[in-house]
């Protein structure tokens, strides 16, 4: 089984290290800069459960060096996907499956859903439908990523908690390709449940991200602080209820209530969201996949999003001023 991880940051690096240590797959990664140089020189190092391991990994700067794969795991952020299409193309053969590990609403959301929205492209995450055309939704295996992982230094990945990567076909079927991939991930020491409704699981994670991420960026607050404050907690709750109405109109099942989801966010503690961290570091922010796409879905199903609209306008303006959004 030939697998390439495209985007070997924290999550991509962790998955690559686990698969490489297991030694059951023909594994490669596409990386760049100091990270690539460190991996080529010293292997990919992983700190997990207090112990450090070294995984010998084939690392390349260009996908042309690797050729067509059985699976390509896209572990880069959603806004980085369109600019990377030319680099990804050499990895795609006639039977290559593509595993999407981005946060937020996926570009393939309306593939295989049936009904009047079947085949709808979402401009917020796939401007002009370029990803849909170049990669093709028929290749996709969806996923929801839960591990907390950090890059401590070039070539050094530190696992904090969590080992679950939920997988699912857009159609909901338990196909051979998703089953085989899940088996390899489990044998590598990961949890890889195969879901028959991956969209609903995507929504449950998105539910918190679309509210807490922009509020955190706007206020400079941690999850615990947002939940502890009556005003920001109410703001997050209103955004989540607007999103829930959109999701349910699309057939999404929310297995928990909004207040339980908010409590879960608060229990994470003094954690800065990824959007706040990106703002502080001057990096591009995941505004479109986490928030703009939900607004776009609301328009498609005729559900009002006044609170989401207001928060989106504010966080987008802030990001533009800081050079973190264009």
Curated annotation (Swiss-Prot):
Enzyme Commission number(s): 1.1.1.169
Subcellular location, record wording: Cytoplasm
Recorded metabolic or biological pathway in which this protein acts: Cofactor biosynthesis; (R)-pantothenate biosynthesis; (R)-pantoate from 3-methyl-2-oxobutanoate: step 2/2
Record keywords, A-Z: Cytoplasm, NADP, Oxidoreductase, Pantothenate biosynthesis
GO BP, one annotated term: pantothenate biosynthetic process
GO cellular component: cytoplasm
InterPro entries on file: 6-PGluconate_DH-like_C_sf, 6PGD_dom2, KPA_reductase, KPR-Related, KPR_N, NAD(P)-bd_dom_sf
GO molecular function term, any single one: 2-dehydropantoate 2-reductase activity
Main location: cytoplasm
Family: Belongs to the ketopantoate reductase family.
Function: Catalyzes the NADPH-dependent reduction of ketopantoate into pantoic acid.
Name recorded for this polypeptide: 2-dehydropantoate 2-reductase
UniProt organism field: Mesorhizobium japonicum (strain LMG 29417 / CECT 9101 / MAFF 303099)
């Amino acid at each position: 089984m030939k697998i390439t991880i495209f985007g070997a940051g924290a999550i991509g690096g962790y998955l690559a290290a686990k698969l490489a240590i297991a030694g059951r797959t023909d594994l490669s990664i596409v990386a760049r800069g100091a990270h690539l140089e460190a991996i080529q020189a010293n292997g990919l190092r992983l700190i997990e459960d207090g112990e450090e391991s070294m995984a010998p990994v084939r690392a390349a700067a260009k996908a042309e060096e690797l050729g067509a794969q059985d699976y390509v795991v896209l572990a880069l952020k959603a806004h980085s996907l369109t600019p990377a299409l030319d680099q990804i193309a050499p990895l795609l053969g006639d039977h290559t499956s593509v595993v999407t590990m981005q946060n937020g609403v996926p570009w393939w959301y309306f593939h295989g859903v049936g009904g009047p929205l079947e085949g709808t492209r979402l401009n917020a995450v796939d401007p002009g439908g370029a990803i849909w055309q170049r990669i093709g939704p028929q290749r996709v295996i969806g996923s929801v990523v839960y591990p907390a992982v950090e890059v401590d230094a070039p070539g050094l990945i530190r696992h904090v908690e969590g080992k679950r990567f939920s997988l699912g076909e857009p159609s909901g079927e338990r196909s051979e390709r998703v089953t085989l991939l899940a088996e390899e991930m489990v044998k590598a020491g990961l949890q890889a449940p195969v879901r028959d409704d991956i969209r609903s699981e995507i929504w449950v994670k998105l539910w918190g991200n679309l509210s807490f991420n922009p509020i955190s960026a706007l206020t400079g607050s941690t999850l615990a602080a947002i939940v502890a404050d009556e005003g920001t907690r109410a703001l997050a709750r209103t955004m989540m209820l607007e999103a829930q109405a959109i999701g349910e109109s699309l057939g999404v099942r929310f297995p928990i209530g909004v207040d339980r989801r908010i409590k879960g966010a608060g229990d994470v503690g003094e954690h800065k969201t990824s959007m706040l961290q990106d703002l502080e570091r001057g990096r591009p922010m995941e505004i479109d996949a986490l928030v703009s796409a939900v607004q776009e879905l609301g328009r498609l199903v005729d559900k009002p999003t006044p609170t989401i609209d207001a928060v989106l306008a504010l966080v987008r303006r802030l990001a533009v001023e800081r050079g973190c959004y264009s």
